[in-house]
Amino acid sequence: IVLHGRAWGELYVARQAGQPVFDRADADFATVLAAVVASGIAQTERLEEVRKLAFTDPLTGLANRRAVDVRLDEAMERHRVDATVVSLVVCDLNGLKAVNDTHGHAVGDRLLERFGSVLSLCGAMLPEALAARLGGDEFCLLTAGPPADAVVGVATELCDRAAVIELGDGVACGVASTGDPIGPVRSARRLFRLADAAQYRAKAARAPGPVVAGRDGEVVRLADSPPKSAHDRRRLRGNRP
């Protein structure tokens, strides 16, 4: 079986003892069959590559926003069915603009890649966590199952590691979890708004660790309040369906 000009595998055919030996027509049929198998494998690989491109951030190799939306909707459905704890950590990498302005966008991209690696390593501490880049300097970590305290612990570790990344200026990190006292969370949009509000508060306070919705009394109020202006960054995910 030849795939992309290289030997991918072998196809064997056999007959029971006493049956006629294979002739040229049989060999030709086997060749055609191998080509059909190779075509099917190639198509499957192409579809997998398209799927990967559709759900992967090309710079960091992490999941992208589309993947987060799909996984978060699935997680919230589990939460509605059996009260699975769903947690969202939203991060804003500090200092990226200064790095881009001072050292160039290539260096800024390397900073994003380094933080993406740190996020992936921290995400591996939680079962089936999804590490993603939402776009620009924003990242997130999504979990379904681990308790809120475990997620906050990993978010704290993430902040500690981000603080020592070369050329970086730490990370503003907000956490929202259905395992914390944040009121009913019936939609992915609500959880995103709470996590975004927590991250917004962490950014404003330059908090060294994560700000957690339900543990910081201002976060829920901030999530529920209207934007103060058209340029308020809390509008970023406010219109998410």
From Swiss-Prot:
GO terms for cellular component: plasma membrane. This is Uncharacterized protein in hutH 5'region. GO terms for biological process: cell adhesion involved in single-species biofilm formation; negative regulation of bacterial-type flagellum-dependent cell motility. Residues 231-241 have a biased composition (Basic residues). Residues 84-216 form the GGDEF domain. SUPFAM superfamilies: GAF domain-like, Nucleotide cyclase. One of its GO terms (molecular function) is diguanylate cyclase activity. InterPro entries: Diguanylate_Cyclase, GGDEF_dom, Nucleotide_cyclase, Rev_trsase/Diguanyl_cyclase. It comes from the Bacteria. Residues 215-241 are annotated as: Disordered.
